[in-house]
Amino acid sequence: MTTNVGSPAVGIAVKAEQNVLADRFKTAVKDCDVERKENLSGYRQKWVQWMSWYGYGAPEPNNIQDQIHRMLFNDLTYRATASVRSSVEAGMEISARSATLVYLLDQGYVVSQVLALQKLLDNGSDVISVKRLLKNVEKHRPFITREVYVAGDGLPYDFTSWADTVDKSDPMVQFYGIDAPGLRRFAMSKQLHETFDQLSGKKPDQRTRQDVIPKSIFRTLDSWISGPRFEEIKDLRDKVIAHAANALEVGKSTFNGVSFSQIDELQRAIVRVVHALIDEILSIRITRPVVPIAPLGIFRGLDLLYSPSDAEAKMHQRWDDLSEERNGWNAGVLQEVTFSPTSP
């Protein structure tokens, strides 16, 4: 995922490891080229809050970026691990096709994905979710005016004023114009204006400082993560978790109504809505991947024998021991529930 909204030469995006909050609002509100200072103050407060929900700024263990990373990490790890079931020739006996391992892996995968998707789409007002972020940004969209979007962190509002700040006889200026070295602030301003043109539906000759993003943009984003296909997630959550033993069709790409293509579609919609909000509407300006980098050696050891042949009997014995313990949990229930030394 990238936040570069224009020419790569301008470098409007920074690397993900850089602190997005460190320098973003280094310029005081009073020194910004913004007419409505109180509006900018309100925007900055909300922007910091929105970024903490997303995963930058104040620590939030359930932030949206971490939720998405966990969801995608689990998804890719499962699919890559399970792929050997079909990639290895059918005649070769491998533990990857063991009915028990297949059942446990498949069940864990489906449950983790359904829960992750449902959590990101939770519409509650007390959770950190994509739905809540979308609703909150829309609610406060009057803060996001063109002048705040372009000049709210110290950039010039009028990018055409660059010509008054340079030596026009400079060969670099004559060749590159606004993209010449030393004019980065003006080039960024120009790009942000162009992006806001798209968001606001305005042409360059219609620009005003108080342009805002229309509600239709937010309605479109909401439609991407709403409707019957997303309502099904709630039903799937209940069905898969409450009746997990019957939810799996071993070795198939469908789990009683949950398909890989369906999961792909829901994941993609969530990722794209988050990109629209964080990268375009809130202009985070950070380049980062959608999927976290895989740890070194993530699949190391999967080529080893799962257990020696004589371990099967020990597994059966362990099952029997655990069963005996749990079957004894009902013993003495009546005596314990009816005995209370503190009863009158």
Where are each of the predicted segments found?
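Histidine-centered, metal-coordinating catalytic motifs and their short helical/loop contexts
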Residues: 223-250
